[in-house]
C-alpha cells in the first residue's frame, strides 16, 4: 500500500497489523561518477499493548507488563553474564546508533533525491536538444527534396499540393513536446497520468534502454550487501594500482621532459662481466631504456645478455653515472703482505742452485758436500727431479742447495731453480767442456739475475782440460777472475774431495756480498719446489720458505690448492715444529698436489683460502677452455685443409702417471718437442700417483696406452687393464720413455714415395677386343716395361692420363717384363682413350719408411 493511501485512511481506524514495512532507496556509487539505486525494505515489529485506542498510540504500560519486561532484562543479562545496568546501557547505545544511522540515511536520501532531480533535468534538456536537432535536419531534408522535385518537373500539378502536406509533419515534435509538458504538469499536480504522457515515458524508457552504457560490466561485477549499501561511498580511496600508474606516468613525464629535471648521478660498481638487467638495476634505470640505447648503437641485446666492463662503462657514462671497476682478481690483493722494515730483517742462509749438463757430476758434488750418496739411488745415474737440502758447514754456516736435473727434458725445472735461488753454481766437466744444457743453464741464471760460481768437476781425470772450459765460457759472457773477470771459478773433485772447501768459501763470500736477510717474525711465504702424491701421506709439497716462519697448523694457499699444515718434514725425515727462511721442508695437509713453481702463502682464515683457490680454479678452467677451443679445428676448417691438400696431424693419445709433478711436466714438454706437423703425442691425462681403475677406463675409451714413470698399478687396475686390453708400460728412465714414443710416432708417419723411371713405348696400332676394351700394340723404344707398373699416356708430349698397367702380353702370352726393341700389347685400368702415335711412359713407385729425427 502506498503512502498516499495511508494518508487518505488516516481519519479512520487503522487496521491491526503485526509487521510494518517501510521501504526506501539506497544509492550505490561506482567509479567515474556512476551510481545505482537499490530499494531497501526494513521490517519493524510493532509492540502490542494491553489497551489500545483508535489513534494507534499505546497507553501507559501496566505494572504487570513492566515487571515482565524487567524480568526479561534480568534473564537476558544473566544469560550474557552482565548486569542489568550494563545491558540497559548497551541497549541505549544501540538505540542511539540506530537513530544516527536513520538520520544519516535520511540525509543521504535527500542528497540522492536532489541528484536524481538534477539528473532528470539534464536528461530532459538533452532530449529536447536532440529533438530540436532532428527537427532541423528533417526540415532541411524536406527543403532539399522540394527543390529537387521543382527542378525535375515544373509541369507536375500534384507536387505543389503534396509539399504543403509535408510541413505539418515537420511540426509534429512540438505537439509531442506539448503533450510531454502537459503530462509533466499533470504528474506534478499529483493526478493520474494521461495516455500521451504514459506513451512519452515509455518512449523515453525504450530510448534509455537501447542506449549502450559503458559501466554495465562494472555494475554487474560487484555484489551488493547491506554494509555496502548503507556505507558512505563518498570517501572511496584510490587503489594501489591507480597510484602506481600515476607515479609511472609522472616518471615518464619527467624523463621525457629533457634537461628540465637533472637525474642524480650515482657511482656504479662494475665487475668484469655483467648482464644488462643487473646494470640497469645498479644505475636505477629501466631495462627497456638500456636495451633501447644498445639498439641505437646497433647491438641487438636483451636484458639477460652479458656485456664486458668496457661496454658497461660506456652505457653508464651515457646515462650520466660514474663507474668504479672491480675485478675477480681483487681477492688476491694484499695476499703477499707488506714489505719488511730494515730493522726487522735478520741474516739468512743462501739458497744455491746446482745447474749444468747431464752427467757432469752435479749430484755427486752435492753428495760430497753432504757426505751422502744420493746419486747412487738415482735411476740411470741421472737426477729426474729437484732435490732440496740444507748443509751445515764446519764453520757453523748453513747453505741450502737445490739440485736440478741436467737432462734436456727438465728445462722448466732448471728455470724454477734459477728463479728461486740466490747463487747459481754452474757445474762443467773438465773432460767434456760446455754442452747444450750448460748453455741453457747460463741463460736461466742470467734471466733470473743471480750471480754464477763456476765449478769445474772431474779435474782429476787424465783427459781433463780446465783451461778449455774457461776459454769456452768466454763465448757466453762468463769471464772468470783468472782472466780478469768477476766470476769465481773453482776446480773440484767429488771423488777425492779436492776443492770442496774452496767452493764453500766462494759461496760464503758471494753471500756476504749479497747481504741476504729476511724477517722471520711474520706470516710465511715461499715457493713450491716439487710436489707428489704419497701413499699414506696424501699430497706432499716440497716448499722453500723465503720469508717468515711456517708453523704447524697454519692455513696456506699454494696455487689452486689450500690446506692446513699437518706436518713439516725436513730432508732427513725428521718432524719440525716450524720452518724459517731458506729452509726446505715437505708440507703435508694440502687438498691436492700444487704445480711446481707456485707460490705458497699463509692466510688468516679458511674462508679467505677457499675464496682465493676458487678464483684460481675458475681462471685455470677458463684458460684451459680457451686453449681447447683455439686448438679444436671446426669441420669447415678441416674440410678446407683436406681440399687444399694440407697435412692432417695424426695424434697418439697417452695417459701419463708420474711420481712427482715435475717429472710429469718434463715428460709432457719433451713429447711436445718431438711432435711434428704430421704426428703428435698428446697427453690426454697427466697426474701424480699410482695407476688406478679410472686411469684404465680413460685409456680404454681413448684407445691410449698408459705410461707409468716410477709408479705402479694396483691389483684392481692391472686386472681391469688385462680384461680391457689396455697396455701399461713402466719406465724409470726418461730416455727410454721418449725413445719408445718416438718409435711409435715414426710408425705413424706416411711413407715417403720415390719414383723410378722404367722406359718408353710407342703405340703402333689400337685393337678393340670384346670384354677387354681397347688394347694398344706397342714397341718398346727405351728401357723396359713391367707388369703392374705405373704408366703415363703422352699425347704431343702432354700428359693426358696417369694410371696403372692392366695387362702386358707378348703375342698371346701374359708376360711380366718386355725389354727395349720388342713389341707387346698393353691395356690400361679404367681408361680406353688411346690413339695411334701416343707415347707411354712407364715408371715404378717405391715406398720408403720415415723416422723422426
Swiss-Prot record:
Q: In which residue ranges is the amino acid composition biased (Basic and acidic residues)? A: 94-161, 196-219, 245-265
One GO MF annotation is:
GTP binding
Q: Which CDD domains match?
A: IF2_eIF5B (cd01887), IF2_mtIF2_II (cd03702), mtIF2_IVc (cd03692)
- Determine if ATP-binding is one of this entry's keywords: no
Outline the extent of the tr-type G domain: 347-515
| Keywords (A to Z) from UniProt | Cytoplasm, GTP-binding, Initiation factor, Nucleotide-binding, Protein biosynthesis
Positions of region (Disordered): 1-68, 94-265
Q: Where is the composition biased (Polar residues)?
A: 20-32
What's the superkingdom here? Answer: Bacteria
Q: Where does this chain mainly localize?
A: cytoplasm
Q: Which GO terms describe its cellular component?
A: cytosol
Region ranges (G2): 381-385
InterPro entries, alphabetically?
Answer: EF-G-like_DII, IF2_assoc_dom_bac, IF2_II, IF2_N, P-loop_NTPase, Small_GTP-bd, T_Tr_GTP-bd_dom, TF_IF2_bacterial-like
User: Which residue windows does the record flag with biased composition (Low complexity)?
Assistant: 163-176
According to the record, the signal peptide region is none
Q: Where is this region: G1?
A: 356-363
> Which residues make up the binding site for GTP?
356-363, 403-407, 457-460
User: Between which residues do disulfide bridges form?
Assistant: none
Q: What does this protein do?
A: One of the essential components for the initiation of protein synthesis. Protects formylmethionyl-tRNA from spontaneous hydrolysis and promotes its binding to the 30S ribosomal subunits. Also involved in the hydrolysis of GTP during the formation of the 70S ribosomal complex.
Protein name according to UniProt: Translation initiation factor IF-2
Amino acid at each position: 500500500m502506498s503512502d498516499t493511501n495511508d494518508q487518505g485512511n488516516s481519519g479512520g481506524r487503522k487496521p491491526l497489523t503485526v509487521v510494518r514495512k517501510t521501504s526506501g532507496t539506497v544509492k550505490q556509487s561506482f567509479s567515474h561518477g556512476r551510481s545505482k539505486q537499490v530499494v531497501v525494505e526494513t521490517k519493524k515489529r510493532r509492540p502490542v499493548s494491553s489497551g489500545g485506542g483508535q489513534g494507534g498510540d499505546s497507553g501507559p504500560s501496566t505494572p504487570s507488563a513492566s515487571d515482565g519486561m524487567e524480568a526479561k532484562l534480568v534473564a537476558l543479562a544473566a544469560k550474557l553474564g552482565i548486569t542489568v545496568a550494563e545491558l540497559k546501557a548497551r541497549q541505549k547505545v544501540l538505540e542511539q546508533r540506530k537513530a544516527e544511522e536513520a538520520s544519516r540515511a535520511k540525509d543521504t536520501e535527500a542528497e540522492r533525491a536532489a541528484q536524481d532531480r538534477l539528473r532528470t533535468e539534464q536528461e530532459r534538456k538533452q532530449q529536447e536538444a536532440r529533438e530540436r536537432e532532428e527537427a532541423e535536419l528533417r526540415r532541411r531534408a524536406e527543403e532539399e527534396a522540394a527543390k529537387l522535385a521543382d527542378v525535375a518537373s515544373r509541369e507536375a500539378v500534384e507536387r505543389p499540393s503534396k509539399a504543403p502536406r509535408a510541413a505539418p509533419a515537420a511540426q509534429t515534435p512540438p505537439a509531442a513536446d506539448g503533450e510531454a509538458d502537459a503530462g509533466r504538469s499533470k504528474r506534478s499536480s499529483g493526478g493520474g497520468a494521461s495516455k500521451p504522457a504514459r506513451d512519452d515515458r515509455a518512449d523515453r524508457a525504450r530510448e534509455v534502454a537501447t542506449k549502450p552504457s559503458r559501466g554495465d560490466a562494472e555494475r554487474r561485477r560487484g555484489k551488493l550487501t547491506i554494509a555496502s549499501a548503507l556505507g558512505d561511498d563518498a570517501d572511496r580511496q584510490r587503489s594501489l594500482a591507480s597510484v602506481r600508474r600515476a607515479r609511472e606516468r609522472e616518471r615518464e613525464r619527467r624523463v621525457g621532459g629533457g634537461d628540465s629535471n637533472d637525474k642524480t648521478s650515482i657511482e656504479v660498481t662494475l665487475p668484469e662481466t655483467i648482464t644488462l638487467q643487473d646494470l640497469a638495476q645498479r644505475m636505477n634505470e629501466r631495462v627497456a631504456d638500456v636495451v633501447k640505447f644498445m639498439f641505437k648503437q646497433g647491438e641487438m641485446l636483451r636484458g639477460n645478455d652479458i656485456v664486458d666492463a668496457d661496454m658497461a662503462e660506456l652505457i653508464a657514462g651515457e646515462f650520466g653515472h660514474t663507474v668504479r671497476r672491480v675485478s675477480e682478481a681483487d681477492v688476491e690483493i694484499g695476499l703477499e703482505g707488506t714489505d719488511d722494515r730494515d730493522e726487522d730483517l735478520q741474516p739468512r742462509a743462501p739458497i744455491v742452485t746446482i745447474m749444468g749438463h747431464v752427467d757432469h757430476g752435479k749430484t755427486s758434488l752435492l753428495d760430497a758436500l753432504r757426505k751422502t750418496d744420493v746419486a747412487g739411488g738415482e735411476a740411470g745415474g741421472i737426477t729426474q727431479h729437484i732435490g732440496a737440502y740444507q748443509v751445515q758447514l764446519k764453520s757453523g754456516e748453513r747453505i741450502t742447495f737445490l739440485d736440478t736435473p741436467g737432462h734436456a727434458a727438465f728445462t722448466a725445472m732448471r728455470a724454477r731453480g734459477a728463479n728461486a735461488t740466490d747463487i747459481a753454481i754452474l757445474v762443467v766437466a773438465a773432460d767434456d767442456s760446455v754442452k747444450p744444457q750448460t748453455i741453457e743453464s747460463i741463460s736461466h741464471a742470467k734471466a733470473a739475475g743471480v750471480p754464477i760460481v763456476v765449478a769445474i768437476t772431474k779435474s782429476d781425470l787424465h783427459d781433463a782440460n780446465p783451461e778449455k772450459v774457461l776459454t769456452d765460457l768466454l763465448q757466453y759472457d762468463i769471464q772468470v777472475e783468472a782472466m780478469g773477470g768477476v766470476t769465481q771459478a773453482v776446480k773440484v773433485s767429488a771423488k777425492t774431495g779436492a776443492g770442496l772447501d774452496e767452493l764453500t768459501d766462494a759461496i760464503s763470500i758471494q753471500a756476504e756480498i749479497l747481504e741476504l736477510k729476511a724477517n722471520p717474525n711474520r706470516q710465511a711465504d715461499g715457493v713450491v719446489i716439487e710436489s707428489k702424491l704419497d701413499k699414506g701421506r696424501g699430497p706432499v709439497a716440497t716448499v722453500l720458505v723465503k720469508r717468515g716462519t711456517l708453523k704447524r697448523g697454519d692455513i696456506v694457499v699454494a696455487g689452486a690448492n689450500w690446506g692446513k699444515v699437518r706436518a713439516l718434514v725436513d730432508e732427513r725425515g725428521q718432524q719440525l715444529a716450524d720452518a724459517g727462511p731458506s729452509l726446505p721442508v715437505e708440507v703435508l695437509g694440502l687438498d691436492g698436489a700444487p704445480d711446481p713453481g707456485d707460490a705458497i702463502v699463509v692466510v688468516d682464515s679458511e674462508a679467505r683460502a677457499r675464496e682465493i683457490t676458487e678464483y684460481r680454479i675458475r681462471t685455470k678452467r677458463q684458460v684451459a677452455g680457451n686453449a681447447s677451443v683455439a686448438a679444436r679445428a671446426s669441420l669447415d676448417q678441416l674440410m678446407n685443409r683436406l681440399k687444399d691438400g694440407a697435412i692432417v696431424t695424426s695424434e697418439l693419445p697417452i695417459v701419463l702417471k708420474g711420481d712427482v709433478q715435475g717429472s710429469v711436466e718434463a715428460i709432457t714438454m719433451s713429447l711436445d718437442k718431438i711432435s711434428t706437423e704430421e704426428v703428435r703425442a698428446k697427453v690426454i691425462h697427466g697426474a701424480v700417483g699410482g695407476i688406478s681403475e679410472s686411469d684404465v677406463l680413460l685409456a680404454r675409451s681413448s684407445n691410449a696406452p698408459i705410461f707409468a714413470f716410477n709408479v705402479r698399478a694396483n691389483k684392481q687396475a692391472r686386472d681391469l687393464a688385462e680384461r680391457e686390453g689396455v697396455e701399461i708400460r713402466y719406465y724409470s728412465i726418461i730416455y727410454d720413455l721418449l725413445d719408445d714414443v718416438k718409435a711409435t710416432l715414426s710408425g705413424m708417419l706416411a711413407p715417403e714415395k720415390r719414383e723410378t723411371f722404367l722406359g718408353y713405348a710407342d703405340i703402333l696400332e689400337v685393337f678393340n677386343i670384346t670384354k677387354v676394351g681397347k688394347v694398344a700394340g706397342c714397341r718398346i723404344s727405351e728401357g723396359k716395361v713391367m707388369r703392374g707398373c705405373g704408366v703415363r699416356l703422352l699425347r704431343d708430349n702432354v700428359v693426358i692420363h696417369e694410371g696403372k698397367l692392366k695387362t702386358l702380353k707378348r703375342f698371346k702370352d701374359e708376360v711380366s717384363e718386355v725389354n727395349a726393341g720388342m713389341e707387346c700389347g698393353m691395356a690400361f685400368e679404367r681408361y680406353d682413350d688411346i690413339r695411334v702415335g701416343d707415347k707411354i711412359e712407364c715408371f715404378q713407385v717405391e715406398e720408403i719408411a720415415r723416422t723422426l729425427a
